[in-house]
C-alpha cells in the first residue's frame, strides 16, 4: 500500500521537482546549512504528502519527529522526547477520525479503510503504523542526504567521478547509504536455539544487529572503511534485511538519488563552510548541522530558483 503511493510520487515527478527547487534555491544563495535548509525539508514534505498531513502542519511534524528519536543539542535524556512521541500519536488519532468520516487520496485514508479477515484495523493499529511511517520516512533519507554532502566534500575524488558521470546515481546512492548507516541498530528475537560466532542464542533471546558494523564487514566489502561510489556489489543493510526490511526503502532511495542528481546538475563543487554538529541519539547517527558553500552552475540554477 505505502509503496504504491510512493511510486505515484515518482510517476508525477513531484519529488524530482521538489528536490531540484530546494537545492536550486540553496545553491543560488551560495551558502546554506544543508541539514536544515535542504535535507530536513525534502523527506518530511514527501512523507507528509503521502500520509495526508496538510502543508501548514508539516513544520510542526518535522519538529516532533526530530525530537522523538534524537536531539540536535541535548546529550542527556529530555522529557521533550516523550512529549513529542505522544503528540505524534495524538495528531494521527485525530487524522484517523477525520479520514473515517471523510476519506481522501492518502495513506491514512487507505489504512482507515483497510480490513483484515473482514475486520477494520483498530485506531491503535492505524495510529502506530502512521507513527512508524512518519519517523521512518524522515530520518533515514534526511540523515543520508546530509552525510552524502559531507562525504563528497571530504572525498573530492569521489565527487569528481560522480560529476563526470563515471558512476551512476544508483551506485552512488547505495554507497552513501552504506557509508552513512543512519539507523544504528535493530533488535531481532530468535525463534529457535542457534549460535552466532560461537555464542549460544536461545529461542526468545533478543539479538541486536549493529548496522554500521555490518556495513563495514571486511568479509563482505573490499576496503570497507573507504567511501567508494563505484562499489559493486554493495550488499549493505542500511534498510535491514528479511521480513522486517524497511517498507520505505524504495522512497528513501528515490529521495536520495534526486538530491544527488540535483547536486551534480547545479554545482561544480561544494565545501564545508563551518562547524559540523552531530545529533544525539541512541537509535540514529548523523549530522544535525552542516554549513556548506556551493560553486554554482549558474545558468541552470537561475531557471529553477523558487
Residue ranges and their predicted role:
Residues 1-306:
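Cytochrome P450
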